[in-house]
UniProtKB/Swiss-Prot annotation:
Family to which this protein belongs: Belongs to the ketol-acid reductoisomerase family.
Cofactor(s) recorded in Swiss-Prot or TrEMBL: Mg(2+)
Keyword Zinc part of the UniProt annotation: no
PANTHER family: KETOL-ACID REDUCTOISOMERASE, MITOCHONDRIAL (PTHR21371:SF1)
Positions contributing to Mg(2+) 1 binding: D217, E221
Keywords recorded for this protein, A-Z: Amino-acid biosynthesis, Branched-chain amino acid biosynthesis, Magnesium, Metal-binding, NADP, Oxidoreductase, Repeat
Residues in KARI C-terminal knotted domain copies: 209-344, 345-484
Name of the protein in its database record: Ketol-acid reductoisomerase (NADP(+))
Organism: Shigella flexneri
Role according to the record: Involved in the biosynthesis of branched-chain amino acids (BCAA). Catalyzes an alkyl-migration followed by a ketol-acid reduction of (S)-2-acetolactate (S2AL) to yield (R)-2,3-dihydroxy-isovalerate. In the isomerase reaction, S2AL is rearranged via a Mg-dependent methyl migration to produce 3-hydroxy-3-methyl-2-ketobutyrate (HMKB). In the reductase reaction, this 2-ketoacid undergoes a metal-dependent reduction by NADPH to yield (R)-2,3-dihydroxy-isovalerate.
Length: 491
């Protein structure tokens, strides 16, 4: 099979990369009614599979789970989760032939096997759903022409999808119809009903394309969302310890610092995050972020280029075929780093202390968010898509580090995201070591003293922060998310 994106001509590639429309709430007036009375069969009962299924059932849809015979016979975790929540569970052969919509929510590396197994069982005119388009775009999976192929991609982990639904809200969502598979012209109606059933329409829905979702998703998770957090954690911890900071304190400052800092980002963008600093610290964080952007821009561009060309995907799929040798080696090496093995700090760090002593971390967040956004937009991805795949998801990923450091982040994210994270962080850490060696007192681990600042310089920096395109689009999109619960700030 050929990478689907690479079979398109340039005009088609640009059209699909640039497909992005914020949908009005009136477009979801019918809710999930298009799928009511139809049979929806979910394949896979992980975080997205279970939580989307719970939401869809609560929205009045007929939901069941198709699992492999071995998973049922051995009563594996997927079987237990589905049955304990009262869902009907059966084998592919038992459930797929009756399904009007088959939703594939298995891990990326399983998609080809799953799709090749279920396709012959699907009835004529049924629909196949994804929450990530890697199998269609990067693998180039060929789907029977009578089958409608749609995507509903919540921009949050599965647990968040469920929690926001229970509060009567939802999470921002991308929806798409594969242009090669919409034989009856009903793809958008199916996708809208599915998105409404998960609650996504209450937080904002972008009509996108499989191509735009995949390319922007890969870029975000490899760079700012995971790779930058991992590289930043390792670099900052080593720098603090090198300068005499207690390893336990250094570990907590970083582990909980990302979440505390990005909570401000979630509530008010880069502007609010920077406003949490004193004026001298803000000027220093801005200067550091500009240096970081200059150093890291070629690395961000290389990742985007490799994603667009398919180089990244072909390399990762080769590792799949080699039993994940690279992935597992990188995972093991990460687990042995000084940051991951440092002792726990039992004392309390106040909220403002994370900002005052984390100026470099704030600069890293600002630089990474802006670079990821700018690089995606320069590649033809629309600003709204770039925002969701950079700034919006960052607090959610930072929240995973609080639980069990980088180990937890890499467990929660997909194997695809984890592989890309390691590619980025393994390149970024050595790239930034000369920069780290030139840091000044107060950049990390110590607060910058209060002092006089130049009014004109402060005015210009504030204007530069607030006028960045990601701040403009972010203000609009956050207006749809004002009801989202506040992620608990670390204590």
């Amino acid at each position: 099979m050929a990478n689907y994106f690479n079979t398109l001509n340039l005009r088609q590639q640009l059209a699909q990369l640039g497909k992005c429309r914020f949908m009005g709430r009136d477009e979801f007036a019918d809710g999930a009614s298009y799928l009511q009375g139809k049979k929806v069969v979910i394949v896979g009962c992980g975080a997205q599979g279970l939580n989307q299924g719970l939401n869809m059932r609560d929205s009045g849809l007929d939901i069941s789970y198709a699992l492999r015979k071995e998973a049922i016979a051995e009563k594996r975790a997927s079987w237990r989760k589905a049955t304990e929540n009262g869902f009907k569970v059966g084998t592919y052969e038992e459930l797929i032939p009756q399904a009007d919509l088959v939703v594939n929510l298995t891990p990326d590396k399983q998609h080809s096997d799953v799709v090749r197994t279920v396709q012959p069982l699907m009835k004529d005119g049924a629909a196949l759903g994804y929450s990530h388009g890697f199998n269609i775009v990067e693998v180039g999976e060929q789907i029977r022409k009578d089958i409608t192929v749609v995507m509903v991609a919540p921009k949050c982990p599965g647990t968040e999808v469920r929690e926001e639904y229970k509060r009567g809200f939802g999470v921002p969502t991308l929806i798409a119809v594969h242009p090669e598979n919409d034989p009856k012209g009903e793809g958008m109606a199916i996708a809208k009903a599915w998105a409404a059933a998960t609650g996504g329409h209450r937080a904002g829905v972008l009509e996108s394309s499989f191509v735009a979702e995949v390319k922007s998703d890969l870029m975000g998770e490899q760079t700012i969302l995971c790779g930058m957090l991992q590289a930043g954690s390792l670099l900052c911890f080593d720098k603090l310890v090198e300068e005499g900071t207690d390893p336990a304190y250094a570990e907590k400052l970083i582990q909980f610092g990302w979440e505390t800092i990005t909570e401000a980002l979630k509530q008010g963008g880069i502007t609010l995050m920077m406003d949490r600093l004193s004026n001298p610290a803000k000027l220093r964080a801005y200067a550091l972020s500009e240096q970081l952007k200059e150093i890291m821009a070629p690395l961000f561009q290389k990742h985007m280029d490799d994603i667009i060309s398919g180089e990244f995907s072909s390399g990762m799929m080769a590792d799949w075929a080699n039993d994940d040798k690279k992935l597992l080696t990188w995972r093991e090496e990460t687990g042995k780093t000084a940051f991951e093995t440092a002792p726990q700090y039992e004392g309390k760090i106040g909220e403002q202390e994370y900002f005052d002593k984390g100026v470099l971390m704030i600069a890293m967040v600002k630089a990474g968010v802006e670079l990821a956004f700018e690089t995606m937009v320069d590649s033809g991805i629309i600003e709204e898509s770039a925002y969701y795949e950079s700034l919006h998801e960052l607090p959610l990923i930072a929240n995973t580090i609080v639980r069990k450091r980088l180990y937890e982040m890499n467990v929660v994210i997909s194997d695809t995201a984890e592989y890309g994270n390691y590619l980025f962080s393994y390149a970024c850490v050595p790239l930034l070591k000369p920069f780290m060696a030139e840091l000044q007192p107060g950049d990390l681990g110590k607060a910058i003293p209060e002092g006089a600042v130049d009014n004109a310089q402060l005015r210009d920096v504030n204007e530069a922060i607030r006028s960045h395109a990601i701040e403009q689009v972010g203000k609009k999109l956050r207006g749809y998310m004002t009801d989202m619960k506040r992620i608990a700030v670390a204590g």
